[in-house]
Amino acid sequence: MGIFALFAVLWTTLLVTSHAYVALPCCAIQASAASTLPLFFAVHSIHFADPNHCNGVCIAKLRSKTGDITVETCVNGFNLRSFLVAVVRRLGSWASQENLRLLWYLQRSLTAYTVGFNATTADSSIHNVNIIIISVGKAMNRTGSVSGSQTRAKSSSRRAHAGQKGK
């Protein structure tokens, strides 16, 4: 049970301490190669959007750090919740009260999302945001939601730049 128990405890700790926070702003799930996702041990928190937020779109954010920059990666909330339900259920009688509270939350939110599931709530692209990260003189384009020491919204920059051209 060794590594599996460590894995389950780590995920549960991350989720129980962070599931009360709403993932704001909402984000768009981007198709990505697995190699571009943060490594498991690089994820320092997971934030779920509740069913009454983000227009009912089931998303979650993985937060990881790269140097001084915290990167939030938008992921499919159904998949992550379902995976974690399976992990906590495998704990069986080893599940702590925190594990059981997490399981209750995950199952409740999955049920709520399933009831409201339709073409609109399946499309996270309405929350798409393009940003530029600027840190220590280096810029990096990324689609999604990112927070760091210095960030600037690309769409805001484009609007400001377009306004200057019109003068």
UniProtKB/Swiss-Prot annotation:
Biased composition (Basic residues): 155-167
InterPro entries: Herpes_gL_rhadinovirus, Herpes_gL_rhadinovirus_sf, HSV_GL_alphagamma
Signal peptide: 1-20
Region called Interaction with gH, residue ranges: 18-131
Domain of life: Viruses
Annotated spans, Disordered: 142-167
The keyword Repeat is annotated on this UniProt entry: no
Subcellular location: Virion membrane; Host cell membrane; Host Golgi apparatus, Host trans-Golgi network
Membrane-protein topology: Peripheral membrane protein
UniProt keyword annotation of Signal present: yes
Any one GO biological process: symbiont entry into host cell
Keywords: Fusion of virus membrane with host cell membrane, Fusion of virus membrane with host membrane, Glycoprotein, Host cell membrane, Host Golgi apparatus, Host membrane, Membrane, Signal, Viral envelope protein, Viral penetration into host cytoplasm, Virion, Virus entry into host cell
Cellular compartments per GO CC: host cell Golgi apparatus; host cell plasma membrane; membrane; viral envelope; virion membrane
UniProt biased composition (Polar residues): 142-154
Subunit structure, interactors included: Interacts with glycoprotein H (gH); this interaction is necessary for the correct processing and cell surface expression of gH. The heterodimer gH/gL seems to interact with gB trimers during fusion. When in complex with gH, interacts with host EPHA2; this interaction triggers EPHA2 phosphorylation and endocytosis, allowing virus entry.
HAMAP family noted in UniProt: HSV_GL_alphagamma
The protein's role, per its UniProt record: The heterodimer glycoprotein H-glycoprotein L is required for the fusion of viral and plasma membranes leading to virus entry into the host cell. Acts as a functional inhibitor of gH and maintains gH in an inhibited form. Upon binding to host integrins, gL dissociates from gH leading to activation of the viral fusion glycoproteins gB and gH. Targets heparan sulfate proteoglycans of the syndecan family as well as host EPHA2 to promote viral entry.
Record family assignment: Belongs to the herpesviridae glycoprotein L family.
Protein name as annotated: Envelope glycoprotein L
Species annotation: Human herpesvirus 8 type P (isolate GK18) (HHV-8)
